[in-house]
């Protein structure tokens, strides 16, 4: 594991973190810029592992360093300095961007799901930004601290798709990769799922469409609300940051992100069958609408259900935690969790 303390003050962007240190080396959550935060509780050590990525502005000699990193914390507010759990090799297929890491414990090992982007381009539909090779790759380690190693030789999402934000779900003993198909390729971004081999090394079937972003009444076209991409306005509906959750009454929910009437938001979909295949129906209003997103849920060591998001959605992102109540098949935000409140 390699300390990345020397990134203090660097300029970073989507899918990344930055920090300002203290003399003791301890970090207050409010100091750490992090996008797409992922929390893995470890009951054995009463430690929370919080994963992020660094993408720009860090060099080892002439080689720009890109890595997945982890912070350790006992209380979710005071974080230890980050260490690298996977440095993306210089010759790796996906070194352009490193986004949205998730780490899942499964059958005695730890699996890292991370979204990577290549320089390689894909055929681009009319009136779309240049399409590039992007997908979620799965890596494995014996410890939540890594080091992680790739399971295969590329992404487990379809090779010709712009896919991102891969997450993990197991249904009837079958592991699934659940991910987003990006608006830049298909206009109306979608959520899809593909079954994985027992060792998670490769897909064993064709991807299955779950739903499109535009199906939610609260979602707005990014172009209509003035949300530009690379300086241009596109007619498109964004699908981001999916997370599956089974409520105590057995309802299967998906939390996910897109743009609402004016800001980035978190919505909730529910499976009418209680299974991954759906059909899925959308809550009419978002769960969270104040310019934050990419949700994931975890339970604290005293069994409180907490949602992690980044907020705001650009440039000064911070991890925010909200305690949730399950009310039948519905989630409600009780209030912000922890001391590092906005």
Protein language model regions, located:
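Bacterial N-terminal signal peptides
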Residues: 9-20
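Intrinsic low-complexity, intrinsically disordered segments enriched in polar/basic residues
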Residues: 4, 18-23
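Bacterial N-terminal signal peptides that target proteins for export
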Residues: 1-11
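Carbohydrate-active catalytic/glycan-binding domains of CAZyme proteins
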Residues: 22-342
């Amino acid at each position: 594991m390699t300390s990345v303390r020397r990134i203090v003050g660097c300029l970073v962007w989507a899918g990344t973190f930055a920090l300002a240190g203290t003399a003791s080396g301890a970090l207050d959550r409010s100091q750490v810029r992090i996008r797409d935060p992922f929390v893995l509780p470890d009951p054995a050590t009463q430690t929370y592992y919080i994963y992020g990525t660094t993408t720009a502005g860090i060099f080892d000699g002439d080689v720009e360093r890109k890595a997945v990193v982890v912070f350790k914390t006992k209380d979710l507010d005071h974080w230890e300095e980050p260490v690298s759990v996977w440095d993306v090799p210089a010759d790796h297929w996906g070194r352009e961007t490193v986004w949205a890491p998730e780490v899942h414990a499964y059958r005695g090992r730890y699996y890292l799901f991370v979204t990577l982007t290549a320089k390689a381009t894909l055929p681009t539909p009319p009136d779309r930004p240049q399409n590039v090779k992007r997908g979620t790759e799965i890596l494995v380690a014996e410890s939540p601290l890594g080091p992680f190693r790739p399971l295969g030789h590329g992404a487990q999402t379809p090779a010709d798709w712009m896919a991102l934000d891969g997450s993990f779900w197991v249904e009837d003993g079958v592991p699934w990769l659940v991910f987003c198909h990006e608006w830049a390729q298909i206009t109306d971004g979608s959520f899809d799922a593909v079954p994985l081999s027992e060792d998670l090394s490769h897909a064993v079937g064709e991807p299955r469409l779950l739903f499109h972003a535009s199906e939610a009444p609260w979602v707005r076209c990014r172009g209509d609300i003035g949300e530009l991409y690379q300086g241009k306005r596109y007619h498109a509906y964004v699908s981001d940051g999916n997370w599956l959750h089974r409520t105590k009454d057995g309802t299967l929910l998906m939390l996910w992100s897109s743009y609402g009437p004016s800001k980035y938001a978190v919505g909730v979909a529910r499976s009418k069958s209680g299974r991954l295949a759906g059909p899925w129906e959308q809550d009419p209003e978002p769960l969270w609408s104040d310019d934050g997103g990419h949700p994931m849920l975890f339970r604290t060591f005293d069994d409180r259900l907490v949602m992690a998001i980044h907020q705001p959605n650009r440039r000064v992102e911070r991890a925010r935690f909200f305690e949730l109540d399950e009310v039948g098949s519905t989630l409600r935000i009780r209030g912000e969790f922890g001391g590092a409140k906005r």
